[in-house]
């Protein structure tokens, strides 16, 4: 048992929006667990699409550290990092946290966010969704009403991965607030939040990392593709719930409607950062709105933005933006939503909410 060592798993986002990681071992007597004292590191950016071979060093700057739930025998942390070029001042390709961080720092609206991450578990050996027998499985596996929040081995595939993910996210201290089986066999969802803007994005990336590491153990991989199958099969989204303090306050419904109208004006700008291949998902079918149209409604899962029924009844709360695809970079989505709403409001109160669906 190496109690005199500390293991740091450095995690970053590459040029294609995929996760990378590597670890280093430090002496415990020289380690300070304050984040500001976590050492910077470098990696070969030419091997991740973030640099060329002539100036290939990319700097890793730690920005969030949580307990590493995979290592029990000594002190260890998962260390989320931003990537920088050269002297450490220029954000590297795909460092979208940099702009999100600047906007969140001046957040006068006290935004809270929650993100519902859908995904499909695939078997690495067959290339098919987990426990599917062959690629010509009847369309029943995609269109039946049996799979959403299902129970039972004949229709629920991969629960051991989902429950292990929940457990390890809790051990890491992440704000994971639920899981459920989704509308297609082997499709699942977990939720992160409610958190402030930067935190919800950091935690979603860390939760994705933990999920993908668990999948490795079972010869599986995780797909966040918005439409992993044909046009008639369900897609995977990252429904993004959010509110400002005014939306959460008395008669917040007025500000909720105002927010819906502001999002109408920025629909195209939002869609541009709501995930690659998302046009395959936003077809107006399978509980989605058409990508070329904007709509909102109470309890309407075919709308671009849904006002939950209990929010309308309470006249305050939050919105659910149903447009983001499962493969989003959350920093881009959160930034787009905040920019859409932060144009002429100057708030100075606060309240809270603690649930969303």
Tell where the protein language model's regions lie, with residue ranges:
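Glycine-rich, acidic/polar active-site loops that bind/position phosphate-bearing ligands
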Residues: 1-357
